[in-house]
UniProtKB/Swiss-Prot annotation:
Organism: Lactococcus lactis subsp. cremoris (strain MG1363)
Sequence positions that bind ATP: G80, P81, E82, S83, S84, G85, K86, T87
Protein name, as recorded: Protein RecA
Compartments in which it is found: Cytoplasm
A single MF term (Gene Ontology): ATP binding
Statement: the UniProt record of this protein carries the keyword Cytoplasm: yes
Main location: cytoplasm
Entry's family note: Belongs to the RecA family.
Listed Gene3D superfamilies: P-loop containing nucleotide triphosphate hydrolases
Matches recorded under Pfam families: RecA, RecA_C
PANTHER family linked to this entry: MITOCHONDRIAL DNA REPAIR PROTEIN RECA HOMOLOG-RELATED (PTHR45900:SF1), RECA (PTHR45900)
One of the GO BP terms on file: DNA repair
């Protein structure tokens, strides 16, 4: 049996010039031989310099994320209080992946997924891979097998808090289980992170909030499952419902949704701390017309004067709800404004930008012609009245 040649550390010295270049080339060749091609490369040679993304399913959130969506091959954590819209945000990502022809899996550790609600959000429930594991290790092992297959584009785990270790389930209520879940999650993160990166799978972990006891200063809020997920996540989103969306007046007022604030508290692929405000409507999910209207007004694409909203000098509604209904009924106008907003935030490629510019020019020409036509009609009416 051949013995492995030992390194003589006495011979290790700093190299310079041609000797250094040869030493580096030899080291690279040895690393490639021992660990495989691509195990070490110059950053400029890397094929994945630009982070590729999958859409979050929300325009406002895509903009807040900076890169245009959730990064592929990375871990994302979505956390917040109960009923804040965490699962809704994740399901919109599932729908967006399926819309692009991708495969998504949902590991429902909480056993609380509503198929009808998922369907209303645009999820193809016939194609969605669903698992309801008996214990935490089983759920994470299923996730690992899906990720290492390289066939799945998105895996959602709902939720970390519900991934209960088998030892805790097999034990009695009241038995001490300190640190079991944290150790399980720490081991899972160490194993999954590399596989997720290699297969370019996006893994979304939904998490709940807990409160630390005896905290005098700072926020007492924390997330279960230990610290591993916080460290391994490239993106962390804090989801909180803020303002009620109501219809009717007086005693007849009914809540039909809520304005939800999504804060990007950690982002390794773009500047963090951006905020997305989305309208989550009950039974419908994130309102695409609502978020588009808000962003377009901010960008000056849609003009707001008092309660009136106007696009290309044409009024589209008095009040936000009427303007949203107009955009729902006029898909061509919705698509045109959507393109302009995406172009303004750099979410389009070069060909789409050129297409948007052409559409904008055509739209302006059409609006100008319509305005001139109206002016001619007015002039003719005035002449008739004079006669």
């Amino acid at each position: 049996m051949a013995t492995k040649k030992k390194t003589n550390f006495d011979d290790i010295t700093k190299k310079y010039g041609a000797e250094r270049d040869k030493a580096l080339a030899d080291a690279l060749a040895l690393i490639e031989k021992d660990f495989g091609k691509g195990s070490l490369m110059r950053l400029g040679e890397a094929a994945n310099q630009k982070v590729s993304v999958v859409s979050s399913g929300s325009l406002a959130l895509d903009i807040a994320l900076g890169a245009g969506g959730y990064p592929k091959g990375r871990i994302v954590e979505i956390y917040g209080p109960e009923s804040s819209g965490k699962t809704t945000v994740a399901l919109h990502a599932v729908a967006a992946v399926q819309k692009e022809g991708g495969i998504a899996a949902f590991i429902d550790a909480e056993n609380a997924l509503d198929p009808e609600y998922a369907k209303a959000l645009g999820v193809n429930i016939d194609e969605l891979l669903l698992s309801q594991p008996d214990y935490g290790e089983q759920g994470l092992q299923i996730a690992e097998k899906l990720i290492t297959s390289g066939a799945v584009d998105l895996v959602v785990i709902d939720s970390v808090a519900a991934l209960v270790p088998k030892a805790e389930i097999d034990g009695e209520i009241g038995d001490s289980s300190v640190g079991l879940q944290a150790r399980m999650m720490s081991q899972a993160m160490r194993k999954l992170a590399g596989h997720i990166n290699k297969t370019k799978t996006t893994a979304i972990f939904i998490n709940q909030l807990r409160e630390k006891v005896g905290v005098m200063f700072g926020s007492p809020e924390t997330t279960p499952g230990g610290r591993a997920l916080k460290f391994y996540a490239s993106v962390r989103l804090d989801v909180r419902g803020s303002t009620k969306i109501e219809e009717g007046s007086g005693d007849n007022k009914t809540q039909i949704g809520k304005i939800t604030k999504i804060k990007v508290v950690k982002n390794k692929v773009a500047p963090p701390f951006k905020v997305a405000l989305v309208d989550i409507m009950f039974g419908e999910g994130i309102s695409s017309t609502g978020e588009l209207l808000n962003i377009a007004v901010e960008e000056g694409i849609i003009k707001k004067s008092g309660a009136w909203f106007a696009y290309n000098d044409e009024k589209i509604g008095q009040g936000a709800e009427k303007a949203k209904n107009y955009l729902k009924e006029h898909q061509d106008v919705f698509d045109e404004i959507d393109h302009k907003v995406r172009a303004a935030h750099g979410l389009l490629d070069d060909s789409e930008v050129a297409e948007t510019e052409e559409e904008t020019t055509a739209s302006k020409t059409k609006a100008k012609a319509k305005k001139e036509e109206k002016a001619v009609e007015t002039e003719e009416i005035e002449l008739e009245l004079e006669d």
